[in-house]
Amino acid sequence: MHKARIKLTGTDPEKLAYVCDQLKKIAERTGVDMSGPIPLPTKRLVVPTRKSPDGEGTATWEKWEMRIHKRLVGIEADERAMRQVMKVNVPDNVSIEIELKS
């Protein structure tokens, strides 16, 4: 049977957990095998900026940071299950990549 590998990325881990819970419920309702969610390494994006706009005075810096969290979910690619996965309500800052394998 075909397998679907679903990769979730987002900046809010609670919203990622919400989408993972929805995928778990779909797997339980349709009776397909599911593996995951597997947490992948978190990517940190750090941008240092100077506080003073004119360049005079002491050099004080601010560091802005954004963390990108990732989860990997494997699910059997049953037709009913995949139709329900496509209908999942996804928050704005969560992106989904679905890869089908045989």
From Swiss-Prot:
GO MF assignments: structural constituent of ribosome; tRNA binding
UniProt keyword Ribonucleoprotein, yes or no: yes
Highest taxon, organism lineage: Archaea
Keyword tRNA processing carried by entry: no
Keyword terms: Ribonucleoprotein, Ribosomal protein
GO CC aspect terms: small ribosomal subunit
InterPro entries: Ribosomal_uS10 (IPR001848), Ribosomal_uS10_CS (IPR018268), Ribosomal_uS10_dom (IPR027486), Ribosomal_uS10_dom_sf (IPR036838), Ribosomal_uS10_euk/arc (IPR005729)
GO biological process, one term: translation
UniProt xrefs under PANTHER family: 30S RIBOSOMAL PROTEIN S10 FAMILY MEMBER
Function as written in the Swiss-Prot or TrEMBL entry: Involved in the binding of tRNA to the ribosomes.
Subunit structure as annotated in this protein's UniProt entry: Part of the 30S ribosomal subunit.
Family named by the database record: Belongs to the universal ribosomal protein uS10 family.
Name of the protein in question: Small ribosomal subunit protein uS10
Lineage: Archaea, Methanobacteriati, Methanobacteriota, Methanomada group, Methanobacteria
